[in-house]
């Protein structure tokens, strides 16, 4: 306040002094008047003066205005005037600054008044509570005032809102306001609120902000919408950028799928307004936020897959190949597609299949490379195409092979009708444009990145330089152009290509050294004292020569490792060589290129280093320095140690693979045993069901037997005499047929039981075979279950035998009944009995016989079903027994293999112990010779011992199993 009063006191007297008195009177009226109308009029007058006399109103009226907000909440009009006045005091409008021509000291009034306002945190809480009012004259000024506070002192206001109860939730309600002015200003408020505050970003996201913002964008027409769409997209970027939690929530909420309609740009003639270009640019940037290389790899990969599955990548490729797209949108689309496919094999394969709508159709990669090597294309577009090509080849050995194959003689189109990617890269590599040379060299280096196979394949490429001359290899042509002294950008690109090509590829090093002019050229370049511009080239030449030493397999006697180091010491000097090598990492553009993969340069002359190449320099600089200072004896000892360790590693790897295979076999056997257990449980359940069914059949049979006994006792001679009506003989004949069928079924059942007996005997013999004691616990459990199953089958057999005996008794009783029937058929009817009584008895007997026949049929059907189920059980037992026998044989073989493996592992441990002793003696010799033993060697030997211990433990566990 003293500062503000000092500013006010420094102003000239005159009319302003009169206005100051007026403001003082108005403030007194606001503070002392008891009538609401008087206070309202006074606040309205302060509002009208607040823009022109911002300082005076702010100093004298701020406390009174805050008091009005606290005491007069019931009157929306005075609250609105007070909020507008505070907004005019705190905000810094550009027009206001132009009108006032204020000094730098007065330009800071907004932040000063903001600091006074938020000094009491209750003022911000009061403002948040006022935003709950639905009245337009209260809510809208409140939104503008809070937005201005956030713009002035964002972090402080954010912290107050964060600790305020339901503070963020109240602000989220603004997005649901039906009045567009409040909703749109609410979006601006949330922009300022979420800027650089991860905690608030998470709260806003979980308050359903994504859903509401996407709804607003859809309602406004997606990319064809107005500035509201732009504001929503900026807010979405604030919520998602560098916020892994919100990115995962956005993906899990299936919001990526809702982004696809954004890129449906429509017809070519629909036009591209400035707002549409801005909106689409922000939409593309939002996609890039989700798949940025700076995100965790897992999150980026999941978003890339989701974009392919929902068709978003396909839609982006459609824009990429469309005509009439503005240059900046096309450039940003290329960058977006680049990061969507980077490191994702599925997306990279799809991009390789995209064709441009030309006649004949050409792959999109070829069309993009044509733009990259065309010097008439914009620089930014060429950088974007290079980035797209790099992302296509990133961790994509399949794509690298396809690009290199277009350079090989067998795949080149002899007719010349089509242009391949390899031809375009070669054309750019040897063109007169230095930028095309650099881009083509870097692109070709990415085709060789971490791919030794393609490095060897590229050695086969032959170039026809001129008519009548023999073809020259691509490697030789690169060195020829390098020695011709072209532009620095061209030489840097070629040196980066050669360094990438020769690293980790001894065959390529041999081909490079085979040309006798290469080594003298490199040593000459390094030894010269050139200007600062040539120091980078000298450093790259030193790196290339160091790679030729470090990855040299000594296959050429002329350029063995030791001879090359002697050559460096004589012509250059080791210290000078290391100093020149350090020029690379000390270059000002090196650190800039190492920060991010995208080649983003302000102008072509800054295009010197590639991101992946900086990783290679960081990896090789130290090892090359050590290799230069090592003596020949140390090299020999190191090579011997390396060979020994490689042999040990191969042996250990072999046994690890063997143990891994045995573990897999054990897992398979365990799975098979568990499957057999399940099958046995199912069989046991089936047997239990069969036992219950047999019991039911037995009960039905007993009931039928009782009923037949009652019929034979109670019907007497009347039933026998009723056989003369002509109906009973037919039923009796049918009953005889049914009995015959029962006999045949019984015989069939007995034969099946005999087969089951033989099966049980086979099972017993298999269980008594040698080697039973060596079976695993899981197999023993199966044997117990099979034994239980045998007992159940034996019980089933006894029950079926008893049923057969009972059926035989039933047949005997039926025969007796038939005999009685035939005997009475010959006798005459009893005299004195009427025909009506005889007919009634006959009908009763017929009904009883019909019921008997029906029950007999049901019994027959149930016996048939039982027979079929027994057959199925037999088949399942057969398959189970055969499987158990096979498993037993395999387990015996596996135990023999495990025993052999344990013996081999013991031999290996002895061998490793001997080698450890040799390594220890070598270290002692080195110490005696005065050479320090490096810590890395000790760590490596320690790691080797740990691996040996782990292998020994694994072997013990395997033997125990």
Curated annotation (Swiss-Prot):
Gene behind this protein: USO1
GO molecular function list: identical protein binding
Segments for region (Globular head): 1-641
Name this protein carries in UniProt: General vesicular transport factor p115
Principal localisation: cytoplasm
Compositionally biased intervals (Acidic residues): 934-955
Region (Disordered): 764-784, 929-961
Organism of derivation: Bos taurus (Bovine)
Family: Belongs to the VDP/USO1/EDE1 family.
Stretches with biased composition (Polar residues): 764-782
């Amino acid at each position: 306040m003293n500062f503000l009063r000092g500013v006010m006191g420094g102003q000239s007297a005159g009319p302003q002094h009169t206005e100051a008195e007026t403001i003082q009177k108005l403030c007194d009226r606001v503070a002392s008047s008891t009538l609401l109308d008087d206070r309202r009029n006074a606040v309205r007058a302060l509002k009208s003066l607040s823009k022109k006399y911002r300082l005076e109103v702010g100093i004298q009226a701020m406390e009174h205005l805050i008091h009005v907000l606290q005491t007069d909440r019931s009157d929306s009009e005075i609250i609105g005037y007070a909020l507008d006045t505070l907004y005019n005091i705190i905000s810094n409008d550009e027009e206001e600054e132009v009108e006032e021509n204020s000094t730098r000291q007065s330009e800071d009034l907004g932040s000063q008044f903001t600091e006074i306002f938020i000094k009491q945190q209750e003022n911000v809480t009061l403002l948040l509570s006022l935003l709950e009012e639905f009245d337009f004259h209260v809510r809208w000024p409140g939104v503008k005032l809070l937005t201005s506070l956030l713009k002035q002192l964002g972090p402080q206001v954010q912290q107050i809102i964060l600790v305020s109860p339901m503070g963020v939730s109240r602000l989220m309600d603004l997005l649901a306001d039906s009045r567009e002015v409040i909703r749109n200003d609410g979006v601006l408020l949330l922009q300022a609120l979420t800027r650089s505050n991860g905690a608030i970003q998470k709260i806003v996201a979980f308050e359903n902000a994504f859903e509401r913002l996407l709804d607003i964008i859809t309602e406004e027409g997606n990319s064809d919408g107005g500035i509201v769409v732009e504001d929503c997209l900026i807010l979405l970027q604030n919520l998602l950028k560098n916020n892994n939690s919100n990115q995962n929530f956005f993906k899990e909420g299936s919001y990526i799928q809702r982004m696809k309609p954004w890129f449906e740009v429509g017809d070519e003639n629909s036009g591209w307004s400035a707002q549409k270009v801005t909106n689409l640019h922000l939409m593309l940037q939002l996609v890039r936020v989700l798949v940025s290389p700076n995100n965790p790899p897992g999150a980026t990969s999941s978003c890339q897959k989701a974009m392919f599955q929902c068709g978003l990548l396909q839609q982006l490729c459609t824009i990429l190949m469309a005509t009439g797209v503005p240059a900046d949108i096309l450039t940003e689309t290329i960058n977006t597609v680049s990061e969507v496919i980077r490191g994702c094999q599925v997306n990279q394969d799809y991009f390789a299949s995209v064709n441009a709508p030309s006649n004949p159709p050409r792959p999109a990669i070829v069309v993009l490379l044509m733009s990259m090597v065309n010097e008439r294309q914009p620089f930014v577009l060429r950088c974007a195409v290079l980035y797209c090509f790099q992302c296509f080849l990133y961790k994509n050995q399949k794509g690298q092979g396809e690009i290199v194959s277009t350079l090989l003689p067998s795949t080149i189109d002899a007719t010349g009708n089509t242009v391949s990617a390899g031809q375009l890269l070669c054309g750019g590599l040897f063109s007169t444009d230095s930028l095309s040379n650099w881009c083509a060299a870097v692109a070709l280096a990415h085709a060789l990145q971490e791919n030794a196979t393609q490095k060897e394949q590229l050695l086969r490429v032959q170039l026809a330089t001129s008519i009548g001359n023999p073809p020259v290899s691509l490697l030789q042509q690169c060195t020829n152009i390098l020695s011709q002294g072209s532009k620095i950008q061209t030489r840097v690109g070629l040196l980066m290509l050669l360094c990438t090509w020769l690293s980790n590829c001894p065959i390529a090093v041999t081909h490079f050294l085979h040309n006798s002019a290469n080594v003298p050229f490199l040593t000459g370049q390094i030894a010269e004292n050139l200007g600062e511009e040539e120091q980078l080239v000298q450093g790259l030449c030193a790196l290339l020569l160091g790679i030729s030493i470090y990855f040299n397999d000594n296959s050429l006697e002329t350029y063995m490792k030791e001879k090359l180091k002697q050559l460096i010491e004589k012509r250059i000097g080791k210290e000078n060589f290391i100093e020149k090598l350090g020029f690379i990492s000390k270059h000002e553009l090196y650190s800039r290129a190492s920060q991010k993969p995208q080649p983003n340069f302000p102008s072509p002359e800054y295009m010197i280093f590639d991101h992946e190449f900086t990783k290679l320099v960081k990896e090789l600089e130290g090892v090359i320095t050590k290799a230069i200072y090592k003596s020949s004896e140390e090299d020999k000892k190191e090579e011997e140690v390396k060979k020994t360790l490689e042999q040990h590693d191969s042996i250990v790897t072999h046994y690890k693979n063997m143990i891994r295979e045995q573990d897999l076999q054990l897992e398979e056997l365990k799975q098979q045993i568990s499957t057999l257990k399940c099958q046995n449980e199912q069989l046991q359940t089936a047997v239990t069901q069969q036992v219950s069914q047999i019991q039911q059949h037995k009960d039905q049979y007993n009931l039928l037997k009782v009923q037949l006994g009652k019929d034979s006792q109670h019907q007497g001679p009347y039933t026998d005499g009723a056989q003369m009506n002509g109906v009973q003989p037919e039923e009796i004949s049918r009953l005889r047929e049914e009995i015959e069928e029962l006999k045949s079924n019984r015989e069939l059942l007995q034969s099946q039981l005999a087969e089951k007996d033989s099966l049980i005997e086979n099972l017993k013999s298999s269980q008594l075979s040698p080697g039973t004691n060596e079976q695993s616990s899981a197999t023993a459990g199966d044997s117990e279950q099979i034994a239980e199953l045998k007992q159940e089958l034996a019980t089933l057999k006894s029950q079926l035998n008893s049923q057969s005996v009972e059926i035989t008794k039933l047949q005997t009783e039926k025969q007796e009944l038939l005999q009685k029937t035939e005997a009475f058929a010959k006798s005459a009817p009893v005299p004195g009995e009427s025909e009506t009584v005889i007919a009634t008895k006959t009908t009763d007997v017929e009904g009883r016989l019909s019921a008997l026949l029906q029950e007999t049929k049901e019994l027959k059907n149930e016996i048939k079903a039982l027979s079929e189920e027994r057959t199925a059980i037999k088949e399942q037992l057969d398959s189970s027994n055969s499987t158990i026998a096979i498993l037993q044989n395999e387990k015996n073989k596996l135990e023999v293999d495990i025993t052999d493996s344990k013996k081999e592992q013991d031999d290996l441990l002895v061998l490793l112990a001997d080698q450890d002793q040799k390594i220890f003696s070598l270290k002692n010799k080195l110490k005696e010779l005065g050479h320090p033993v490096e810590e890395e060697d000790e760590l490596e030997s320690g790691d080797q011992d740990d691996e040996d211990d782990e292998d020994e433990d694994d072997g013990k566990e395997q033997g125990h199993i």
